Amino acid sequence: MASLRDIKSRIASNKKMSQITKAQEMVSASKLNRAENKAKSFVPYMEKMQEVVADIAVGYTGKHPMMSSRPVKRTGYLVITADRGLAGAFNANVLRKAYQRIQERHQSKDEYAVIAVGRMGRDFFKKRGIPVISEMTGIRDEVTFSEIKDLANSTVQMYIDETFDELYLFYNHFVSAISQEVTEKKLLPLTDIAPNKKKTSFEFEPDEEEILEVLLPQYAESLIFGALLDSKASEHAARMTAMRNATDNAKEIIADLELSYNRARQASITQEITEIVGGAAALE
């Protein structure tokens, strides 16, 4: 049985830990509010851009490389994770799904490559010997498009240059503060752009082909940025939940330890009384 001093030390340690996890929960809650608003505010922009691209694409008869399927010799995987843990299964879930897809689809490392966003994903793939052709870490919580523009641009350019022939995106989609869904999306080629059912009449200058030449890369880059915003909101939600659970667990442990402490203290006092009574009886 642990001594009173040991139990008291464990109680103090768990109280300090619960204070830390509670503070982290509050920080994550604050960050979640901002990240969620930013992710939601980006949706109308994406919807309008998709509407324009779809309306052009539905009548486009050319063969833009970003809209045309070609024989797949190599597949790219853009995987978005966090730079740190303490977020429950946030990183593990998306990495597990991406790794599973790679194992299912490919026999050789020459058939695929990973673009890793986030330190957790980069370290995961490198540890397993999976080729990482591009990486980005240290992304701020208040991420802006200018921060990830080079990565998004180079990713799209690698597809255009046929470094890979298709690109899949893996990230955590934000559903609510208590729910995030691992999402797999085929990003390139852009063959699944659904035209607007209520077709909007646009006049294009100079012509559709030149507009697509500029708009399609921007659209693909915006999809990447939108997924990153979504992932950031999911990360803060997952960390907030994980820290709340950790705080609750610490409180339960503290309650159990305090009960053990009181029982041990009571047993110690009883033992002392018994010894005093026994000693007094021996003197009579």
Swiss-Prot record:
Keyword Iron-sulfur tagged: no
GO MF entries: ATP binding; proton-transporting ATP synthase activity, rotational mechanism
A Pfam family of this chain: ATP-synt
Predominant subcellular localization, coarse grouping: membrane
PROSITE patterns in alphabetical order: ATPASE_GAMMA
The keyword Electron transport appears for this protein: no
Keywords associated with the record: ATP synthesis, Cell membrane, CF(1), Hydrogen ion transport, Ion transport, Membrane, Transport
Compartments (UniProt record): Cell membrane
GO cellular component, one term: plasma membrane
GO biological process terms held by the UniProt record: proton motive force-driven plasma membrane ATP synthesis
Membrane topology: Peripheral membrane protein
Family indicated by similarity: Belongs to the ATPase gamma chain family.
Quaternary structure and partners: F-type ATPases have 2 components, CF(1) - the catalytic core - and CF(0) - the membrane proton channel. CF(1) has five subunits: alpha(3), beta(3), gamma(1), delta(1), epsilon(1). CF(0) has three main subunits: a, b and c.
Protein task: Produces ATP from ADP in the presence of a proton gradient across the membrane. The gamma chain is believed to be important in regulating ATPase activity and the flow of protons through the CF(0) complex.
NCBIfam families: ATPsyn_F1gamma
Protein name: ATP synthase gamma chain
Species lineage: Bacteria, Bacillati, Bacillota, Bacilli, Bacillales
Gene name of the encoded protein: atpG
